[in-house]
């Protein structure tokens, strides 16, 4: 299981640094890892993220020991499960 780096940072007494990703870019995920971000947040509500992109972002971020959270386009079970099945560790649900 991938450790939740947001909770880990908070447990050590500091706020987690989270990189906000508005479009799919593995280069930005790697750059965020190299400059010290703790996690990636995917903006699936305002940006377009195909399932393959979500898979790849989670894979690369987890390889750098970063958690991935996401804002899903809709709070229906389809979207929630699609993001969770890809490896996202936390969700922001909209319009609840």
Spans of model-derived segments:
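N-terminal amphipathic alpha-helix/helix-capping segment at the start of soluble metabolic enzymes
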Residues: 1-19
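Glycine-rich, proline-tolerant flexible connector loops at the mouths of alpha/beta enzymes
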Residues: 28, 35-55
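Conserved small/polar residues in nucleotide/adenosyl-binding loops
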Residues: 94-96
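Glycine-enriched alpha-helix->loop->beta-strand junction motifs that scaffold or abut catalytic
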Residues: 35-39, 85-90
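Glycine-rich beta-to-alpha transition loops that act as phosphate-gripper elements at the mouths
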Residues: 21-24, 70-77
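Active-site-adjacent beta->alpha loops and helix N-cap segments on the catalytic face
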Residues: 2-4, 46-60, 75-78
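Hydrophobic faces of well-ordered beta-strands that scaffold small-molecule active sites
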Residues: 17-19, 40-42, 68-70, 91
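Catalytic cores of alpha/beta
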Residues: 77-86
